[in-house]
Each structure stands twice: as structure tokens, then as C-alpha cells.
């Protein structure tokens, strides 16, 4: 049996680095939540236990999915999952908003489910299934349009019904990348149009951050989404309002310096962040572990993502390319939006730092996505030269 490429080292790196990040994230969640434990002697214990449960389920899911034969799952099951996730996304509206977003389903007082996190991963594996074979031009176009419509429906529900701008952006970027990968005939024209649309979208973002537009926005700063754009343009101008938390984030970065104050010694987590263990966990990490800690985090992410990119470039199978590159984009866009938001480079989006931030849904979804990626890499390891999908 001839192997097209061997990713044994890459697979081990992904597994080892992922588990290290999960453990590190759990420790940092415990540290970040110290500020909320004042006056409640059992709060921190509950947080640690809950995070440990999520981490355990995530790791088990990772290894279980790694052994899945994704290509054998019928397309009809994907449509069932799609509808199920869609209903879950809409059902979130029946529950209370958190920071202006209706993105969670409450399971009593113990935990929540965020369906949008699973929607992101689903659209990756669904795209891999839908575009795995090159059919006739008509079939290819129908599949392309079908995927686009289904992605738009998810995007609209997350953006309008849930009011979750960050998750909508992540989903949109993932689906765009998935649709740009297939080299199948008959869709090149549509892919070119999508590229033009993305260029316009980027120009619109720069336009929204320009001085004339931000001056107009000042009269509507009570809107939380507009307030985030204003805070990104000039956080110090809104230091008592929308820019306060961003400024405190920058102060935490400066306070951490090179080596940090030491684990558990962050000062600003006690009073200056609305979600110190989620959206703003990076300032806590840098304040306690310094710039050295941040670079260590970047290296660990690199050990997870580089093998995915390498496998995507080496594989000759469209489905493998979509899964590996889709997961790569999923992690990368989360990292960019989270770091850029707390670093005052872009508006805050509320997206978590995958494998690090608190939240069972994001941890489980991210570990599942890596499991799907590993399943594809393992499959490519042992596939026959003449074996086709």
C-alpha cells in the first residue's frame, strides 16, 4: 500500500498540543474566575469542576470522531443535522440575552448550549461531503448554490435573530473559504463573484471605521454594536463607556510586561472585565504570564494549525482539503477576532479563544473539529493510490 503523504508527526503534534492547550485553558479559566469568587467560597470549585467536565467530554469526543469514517455517512443525515441546528439557533431567542446576544439555550442554572459554535463546524464537514465528488456542471452548480443558500440562512438567523455579530462573521468566513476550495467544473464564475463581494465587504469595514462615519455613529453610541465600532476607532474617547474594557485590556498587557506578575496574580480580572474567563481571558493571560506567555500560546496554536495546513496542501482529495483548511480557518479567525478585539485593533466581537476560553460549547465544538481533521489525516495516511472516493 503506497502512502501519498505521512502525517504521523503532525497527528501527534495536533493531539499533544490540543490537550496541552485544553489543560492550560482550564488553569487560566480557574485563575480568571477568581475575581468572581469573592464572597462565594464554593464558586471557584464549581467553575473548576464544570470546566474539567467540559474538557473531559471534549477530549473523548476528539478521539471518538478521529475514528469516524466520515465519507460513509449519507448526505440525508447531514440535512437532518442542518435542520436540527437551525431550530436550535432559532430557539435561543426564547432565552435571555447575554451582552445583547440571544445565542444560548439554558440548561437549568448549571450550563448553556451555544448552537452557533456547532453550526460553524457542521458547515465545514457538510461542505466536505457536498463537494467531495466532481459531477456534471449542472450538479456542481446546484450543489454550490445549495450550500450558499444554506449558509446564508444560518448567517441571517445568527446575525438577525440571535444578534450575534461575532459568530455570524466567523460562520461567513468559514463558509466562504469552504466554497472557494472545490476545483470542480462549472463554479469558477461564482467563486470569482464571491471574491469580488469579499473585497467590497472589507472595504465597507474600513469605511465604517473612517472618521466621517464614526462621527455620525457618535449620535447612536447607545447601540451596543455601534458602540463597539466607536471603541475600536478610539477607545480613549469612550473610556467611561464602550472603550473602558478595551483600555483596561491594554493596561493589563502593559502590566504583564515580559514575564508577567505570576499565575493567579492578575489585578484587573477582579473588577475591569465583564467576562474575564471568556472574551477577555487573553489580557489575564498576558498580565499573569507576560509576553512570554503570549508567544508560548501562539507557538502551541501553531503546532495545532501548521499540520492542518500542510495536510490540506498535500492532499489531492477535495473533501480532505475542505475539512483541514476549514478547521484551520475556524481556529485562525477566532484567534484574530479575539486578539484583535481585546487589543483595540478591531471592534470587539465576543468570540472566544478556542480551547482556552470558558464555555462548554466552544470547547466541545473546537475539539470535535480537530477530531474531524484528524480523521481525514489518518484516512489519507492509509489510502491506496488507486482508491477513489
Indicate residue ranges for each PLM-predicted region.
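Interfacial segments of multi-pass membrane proteins
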Residues: 169, 175-188, 267-293, 352-364
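Alpha-helical transmembrane segments of multi-pass membrane proteins
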Residues: 21, 88-92, 129, 155, ...
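Hydrophobic, glycine- and aromatic-enriched re-entrant/interface helices and adjoining loop segments
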Residues: 192-293
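Membrane-helix boundary/helix-loop-helix interface segments in multi-pass membrane proteins
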Residues: 2-8, 12-13, 27-162, 339-354, ...
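Loop-to-helix entry and N-terminal half of a specific, functionally important transmembrane alpha helix
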Residues: 309-349
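Hydrophobic alpha-helical transmembrane segments
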Residues: 52-61, 288-306
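Structural signal for the C-terminal ends of transmembrane alpha-helices
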Residues: 60-71, 127-136, 176-187, 208-210, ...
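Hydrophobic alpha-helical segments of polytopic membrane proteins
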Residues: 78-79, 83, 145-157, 165-217
